[in-house]
Amino acid sequence: MAKHPFEQFNLESSLIDAVKDLNFEKPTEIQNRIIPRILKRTNLIGQSQTGTGKSHAFLLPLMQLIDSEIKEPQAIVVAPTRELAQQLYDAANHLSQFKAGVSVKVFIGGTDIEKDRQRCNAQPQLIIGTPTRINDLAKTGHLHVHLASYLVIDEADLMIDLGLIEDVDYIAARLEDNANIAVFSATIPQQLQPFLNKYLSHPEYVAVDSKKQNKKNIEFYLIPTKGAAKVEKTLNLIDILNPYLCIIFCNSRDNANDLARSLNEAGIKVGMIHGGLTPRERKQQMKRIRNLEFQYVIASDLASRGIDIEGVSHVINFDVPNDIDFFTHRVGRTGRGNYKGVAITLYSPDEEHNISLIEDRGFVFNTVDIKDGELKEVKAHNQRQARMRKDDHLTNQVKNKVRSKIKNKVKPGYKKKFKQEVEKMKRQERKQFSKQQNRQKRKQNKKG
């Protein structure tokens, strides 16, 4: 009988059964590179986007390392949001059903802390949760985090954004000196460096460029909003799209609320994820989103980070993000695995610069507009810039010609004469260029 691809990691048979139950056919790139390193108890920094199989890249080896006979904490996984912590717990709990004798518990904010204290009477071998709640339980002595020999920090860049790195620091400081730490982050911001330097001795760096794969799976469209308001364009898009699930991203909570109000007034039912929701409202919204009550979900960047929503077929950028890293996070919600995705960005003239910065990251757009109920190609947004660059190049060429023409003839009125000569030659060059373009168009029309 052929070996299962995950057997290459020498995982115990119970975990291979768990992998089969998950229908994992073969390891992803990050799983191939991370699983052996954690099994060797390596300090590491893993840079990867969500949707790459990252969670099981660390959960599987952690489960293998846990000794089911020792009834005390052996590993800790911290996540920046309750939703992500709950998702990690669900994945780990599934694995624990195949490996007998392993206790996994989740500790997150927004729940009754007294009940959490009581749950600590039986210490779990794998602790999963948000850093603040784990800290609260550790400070009172209820949760014995100091006994853990492996700490995994997921979405570390979001820990920075949400101001949680001090809580993570407190947990790391309680560990023994020989404990190992693995840090996972989509980006490595400068603010994260002090923590990495403090706790990770000679870490291995593993970077998985999921962007290339994601870009293959995603169609990127740009829609200009010069002559129409963005809300109107969004409504027009909704008329022609039929997504399985679409996330519409806004730069701020206010923009998200305004857009939701407009769509609701137009009779469109939308879900909402932003920082203004209470923990209870947020939990209810996530449940409704996962139950597919909405085709469209409006989200702000920080509030939606750390939330893994399956089945996103479309992403609409209602606002172009000011932080270009957010663009990567946004579009990475769709086109995951072997699925195709569509990312549509609405932009106004004052957002042109940010679009150029995004293109500098290697993203390639098709510029389209909504015509006759379809997305049809229009002039690329950067054509005018290209013409300006061409004109600048033309001016330099002409100036060089003029200089050589009137060299050694410097007389009164030279500057004025020089300028007139430049303009004259530019007109001639443009005329010549225009003739060439027309000839090319005629040839193309004949071929067509």
UniProtKB/Swiss-Prot annotation:
Disruption phenotype: Cold sensitive. Double cshB-nfo mutants are as cold-sensitive as the single cshB mutant. Coiled coil: none annotated. Residues 419-432 have a biased composition (Basic and acidic residues). Its EC number is 3.6.4.13. ATP binds at S48, Q49, T50, G51, T52, G53, K54, S55. GO terms for biological process: response to cold; RNA catabolic process. A motif (DEAD box) lies at residues 154-157. Pfam families: DEAD (PF00270), Helicase_C (PF00271). Residues 236-386 form the Helicase C-terminal domain. Transmembrane segments: none annotated. It catalyses: ATP + H2O = ADP + phosphate + H(+). GO terms for cellular component: cytosol. Residues 400-448 are annotated as: Disordered. SUPFAM superfamilies: P-loop containing nucleoside triphosphate hydrolases. Probable DEAD-box RNA helicase. May work in conjunction with the cold shock proteins to ensure proper initiation of transcription at low and optimal temperatures. Belongs to the DEAD box helicase family. CshB subfamily. This is DEAD-box ATP-dependent RNA helicase CshB. It comes from Staphylococcus aureus (strain NCTC 8325 / PS 47). The lineage of its organism: Bacteria, Bacillati, Bacillota, Bacilli, Bacillales.
